Design a protein with these regions (language model features):
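N-proximal low-complexity "stem/linker" segments adjacent to membrane-targeting elements
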Residues: 1-41
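Active-site-proximal specificity loops/subdomain of glycosyltransferases
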Residues: 77-137
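GT-A fold catalytic core of metal-dependent nucleotide-sugar glycosyltransferases
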Residues: 119, 123-177
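Catalytic core and acceptor-binding pocket of nucleotide-sugar-dependent glycosyltransferases
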Residues: 154-158, 175, 195-279
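"A position-specific structural signal for the A-helix of alpha-solenoid helical repeats
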Residues: 278-281, 317, 321, 359-363
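Flexible helix-coil transition and linker loops at the boundaries of alpha-helical arrays
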Residues: 302-312, 347-354
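TPR/TPR-like (Sel1-like) alpha-helical repeat modules
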Residues: 335-350
């Protein structure tokens, strides 16, 4: 951004609670292991986020206030609000004994017991509560908000400019959150069976959106947590989000990637391409036109930017599925853009051209629905 210019119409929300110290974890003084890092390492990693000139609301314990403020450049202090919380101040704390009992009686079978302790799971389930409180406080009078894990920029250091671009692209009525695989409501079935295993459905390092959409998402997540506790369960944040997403597709702006690609894939696909392709195929099969369009579009940009190199069949499907989804969504002019683009690439790349020719009869029958003689003629002569 130019000096004196501020285009950030959003507030970033994050948090730090030293649960290892709180629970007197037997590994709390270990320098680092495969399950978590100690506070010194954590804060060094968080410096990349804290050095960004973005309005932030940060939830933490009293003893970490000064340390966090010291990581923010002095010129950004007026864009920083620290909210101090004791554990007893956390939402639903009176339910934690029941949650702990559930944790012991109904363990998640494929999670590390060293990392995913009861209090750790409780804290990560507070993300939506922190976002809710930040929205209600709204100290910077912004219209959009976003949760970001403190260390996420270590994986991909997304700039302020790119962050602004991402926020500007999120529809007012949707929440952008990263999914790793498609979840159909039928998969959930018995909540107890679904929550018995973590299924790697969501990478919850970031979720972003406008005030009302986020509040609705937070409400749904709170409701799902409370029902789960009442049924003797103790899911993680990502498990709860996967259920909320499956049952509320119309609230979700789809974004695909593993945790390492949560930020990297925001503007276009750069990694976890296999996850995105699988998600695209499933969205298309399920007739989820909006998800199909958005996932295909992210992959399309990745191909055009030469950030990814899918197979010829996958490239064809990215454009074809994008066309079909937009046809059903009523975006007919964009359908033409997609088809002209597919024709141009097929004319330039022999293997893709051969693939299109092998599908020509079927493709022409689909293109005919547009009633555009120029496009039909081009593909007929390819």
């Amino acid at each position: 951004m130019r000096e004196g210019e501020d285009d950030t119409q959003f507030t970033i929300v994050t948090a730090w609670f030293d649960v290892r110290e709180f629970e007197n974890h037997h590994l709390k003084d270990v320098d680092e292991n495969g399950h978590y890092c100690i506070p010194d390492h954590y804060f060094r990693s968080a410096a990349l986020l804290f050095n960004k000139e973005m309005p932030m609301v940060i939830f933490t314990e009293e003893r970490y206030r000064d340390r966090i403020l010291s990581l923010r450049p002095p010129s950004y202090i007026d864009k920083t609000v620290i909210v101090i919380k004791d554990y007893c101040d956390l939402y639903g704390w009176d339910l934690f004994p029941r949650f702990l009992e559930n944790h012991q009686n109904a363990p998640i079978r494929n999670l590390s017991v060293e990392k995913f302790t009861a209090i750790y799971k409780w804290i990560i389930n507070q993300k939506v509560e922190f976002v809710r409180e930040a929205i209600e406080l709204n100290p910077f009078s912004t219209s959009k908000f976003g949760w970001m894990d403190m260390r996420l920029h270590v994986v991909y250091d997304m700039s302020v400019e790119e962050t602004i671009e991402i926020f500007n692209g999120i529809p007012e009525d949707r929440v952008l959150i990263t999914q790793c695989s498609y979840t159909h409501p039928n998969e959930i079935g018995d909540r107890r069976g679904f929550y018995e295993w973590t299924r790697g459905k969501v990478a919850a390092g970031v979720f972003l959106g406008s005030r009302d959409a986020l509040l609705k998402f937070c409400d749904l997540c709170r409701e799902e947590l409370l029902v789960s506790i009442s049924e003797g369960l103790c899911p993680t944040d990502e498990m709860i989000y996967s259920v909320v997403i499956a049952r509320n597709n119309g609230l979700i702006e789809p974004h695909i990637g593993d945790y390492s690609d949560v930020l990297r894939n925001m503007s276009h696909n750069r990694g976890s391409t296999h996850l995105a392709i699988n998600f695209l195929n499933k969205s298309f099969q399920e007739g989820n036109h909006y998800f199909t369009w958005k996932v295909a579009e992210n992959l399309r940009k990745g191909v055009l930017n030469e950030s990814i190199c899918p197979s010829i069949e996958q490239v064809y499907n990215i454009w074809y599925y994008n066309y079909v989804a937009n046809f059903w969504l009523g975006n007919r002019e964009y359908c033409k853009t997609i088809l002209y683009e597919l024709y141009r690439i097929g004319s330039q790349k022999m293997e893709l051209g051969d693939h299109i020719r092998g599908m020509k009869g079927f493709l022409l029958s689909m293109i005919d629905y547009l009633h555009d003689s120029d496009i039909t003629s081009k593909f007929r002569d390819l």
